[in-house]
Amino acid sequence: MYEYLDRRYALALYEVAEEKNKVEEYLNDLREICDIIYGNNELYEIIKHPQISTVRKKKTFRNIFEGKIDDELLSFLMVLIEKDRILYLREKLKEMEKIHLERNNTLLAEVKSVVPLTEDEVTRLVAKLENKYSKKILLKQEIDKSIIGGLYVRVGDDVIDGTVKSRLDDMKQIMLKRE
């Protein structure tokens, strides 16, 4: 519902980071900040509690992050607190990561397999995907025993499902239609 808004915030921060040549630093800091927020129940409760003032929330963030992150990034967090959007920081981070991939002509390929792919298999798969999409490919591997065998590849909205599980499901559907 708020994807458009998340993207606008992320784009604004990305452009600041790009101007300062600190995109990777900002992305890493945002990941760590998200881990701190969502990994610390006490901090999370302070942030989401409606009766705790914005001033107190900002002070808490300044105490934790001032001097540890870039001032522009801290200002961004203050704006999110002011606009009551700080609980949606993960969404801003995801959008910023998407923008970073787009700006670097890169696509994320999510690959599921039963066993980890060998280095050679990864190299060949990346080469084929780069050839197909004419973009750099960032491969994210996931082990999933439920697929039984084969590969499941998702690049954006495209899915290549070469898993044994999907073949068995297809055969099951054909058998059920015949009965």
From Swiss-Prot:
Gene Ontology cellular component terms for the protein in this record: plasma membrane; proton-transporting ATP synthase complex
Location of this chain's protein in the cell: Cell membrane
Keyword Lipid metabolism: no
Keyword terms of this UniProt record: ATP synthesis, Cell membrane, CF(1), Hydrogen ion transport, Ion transport, Membrane, Transport
UniProt entry tagged with the keyword GTP-binding: no
GO molecular function: proton-transporting ATP synthase activity, rotational mechanism
Superkingdom of this protein's organism: Bacteria
Topology term for the membrane: Peripheral membrane protein
Subunit structure: F-type ATPases have 2 components, F(1) - the catalytic core - and F(0) - the membrane proton channel. F(1) has five subunits: alpha(3), beta(3), gamma(1), delta(1), epsilon(1). F(0) has three main subunits: a(1), b(2) and c(10-14). The alpha and beta chains form an alternating ring which encloses part of the gamma chain. F(1) is attached to F(0) by a central stalk formed by the gamma and epsilon chains, while a peripheral stalk is formed by the delta and b chains.
Function: F(1)F(0) ATP synthase produces ATP from ADP in the presence of a proton or sodium gradient. F-type ATPases consist of two structural domains, F(1) containing the extramembraneous catalytic core and F(0) containing the membrane proton channel, linked together by a central stalk and a peripheral stalk. During catalysis, ATP synthesis in the catalytic domain of F(1) is coupled via a rotary mechanism of the central stalk subunits to proton translocation. This protein is part of the stalk that links CF(0) to CF(1). It either transmits conformational changes from CF(0) to CF(1) or is implicated in proton conduction.
Similarity section: Belongs to the ATPase delta chain family.
PANTHER family referenced in this protein's UniProt entry, alphabetically: ATP SYNTHASE DELTA CHAIN
Record protein name field: ATP synthase subunit delta
